[in-house]
Each structure stands twice: as structure tokens, then as C-alpha cells.
Regions:
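C-terminal output helix
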Residues: 113-122
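Acidic, metal-coordinating helix/loop segments flanking the phosphotransfer/catalytic sites
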Residues: 35-55
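Acidic catalytic/metal-coordinating carboxylates
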Residues: 38, 66-69
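Short amphipathic alpha-helix used as the core "switch/output" element in two-component signaling
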Residues: 44, 68-81
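Alpha4 helix (beta4-alpha4-beta5 surface) of REC/receiver domains from two-component response regulators
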Residues: 69, 82, 92-107
Length: 149
């Protein structure tokens, strides 16, 4: 288990999953990168983790399941899962875009992925947590208030 902000990649195509994982590992230094080509195993892994925070890179279609089903399955443990997700799709149709909007997913990338687009999306989500951590370190009263939640 990592002490950082981990990235969890889920794509039912093992080759694509491996490529995305290697790409993220080439630039990401704030945690570990875990990858799954089986969404059920990914759900089980997420629910067994101690920490309910991660960045998710999820294919919109996961065999017989949807990426949105995956997010709904882990939402109780990961309350910010939807907003901390990058959905990837071979075809970002109007339906996929509307599902992202309805699910509060702000990042949608089309395959083939452009490495810089993925890096910027991961960085944007990471920045939210880095800013929060800085605020906790700088403001003792704020940190105490958060600890009481």
C-alpha cells in the first residue's frame, strides 16, 4: 500500500491497460499506479484498500460493464471517485459526454490517447490534493477543523 495518491487504471483490453499504466508511470511520482483489465477485480481491490482516495483512469466500456457502473460500485468508499476520474473512450459520442456530465466526471479523453492530454488531466486532479495538503500544513486551525470531520 502506498502512502501517496495512487492511480488506478481499468481497461478491459490488457494491452491498452499496460500502455496507459506505463505512460502514467513515466511521469507520475506522487503514488503508485495499479492496473486492472478485469473490472470486478478492480472493484474488489478498491473496496479492500484502507484509503478511499485515488485517481481513476477508466475505460467507458469494460466488457459487460460500464466505467460508470465501476464508479458507482466504489462511490461509498471513494466519495470523490467521479470527480477524480478520467474516462477514456474509443468514441466520445454525445451519450458518453452526457454520461460524464451527469456523473460529475470532468475529464474525457479519446483513444488513441495523447500522452500530454493524459498527463495534464492526471496533474489537474493531483493539484487539487496537493493544494489541500499545503493548506493543511500551513493552517493549523484548518487542519484541526478537518480532523474533526
Amino acid at each position: 500500500m502506498s502512502d501517496g495518491l495512487d492511480v488506478i487504471v481499468v481497461d478491459d483490453d490488457p494491452g491498452i491497460c499496460e500502455i496507459i499504466t506505463e505512460l502514467i508511470e513515466s511521469f507520475y511520482t506522487w503514488g503508485k499506479v495499479y492496473s486492472f483489465s478485469n473490472p470486478d477485480k478492480a472493484i474488489a481491490f478498491c473496496l479492500e484498500r484502507e484509503i478511499g482516495v485515488a485517481i481513476f483512469v477508466i475505460d467507458v466500456f469494460l466488457g459487460g460493464l460500464s466505467g460508470f457502473y465501476f464508479l458507482d460500485a466504489i462511490e461509498q468508499k471513494y466519495p470523490t471517485a467521479h470527480e477524480d476520474t478520467i474516462i477514456i473512450s474509443g468514441n466520445a459520442s454525445d451519450d458518453v459526454v452526457n454520461m460524464c456530465l451527469a456523473s460529475n466526471v470532468n475529464y474525457l479523453l479519446e483513444k488513441p490517447l495523447k500522452p500530454y492530454a493524459l498527463q495534464l488531466a492526471v496533474r489537474a486532479i493531483t493539484a487539487k490534493y496537493l493544494e489541500f495538503a499545503k493548506k493543511l500544513l500551513k493552517d493549523e486551525q484548518y487542519a484541526e477543523d478537518v480532523a474533526r470531520l
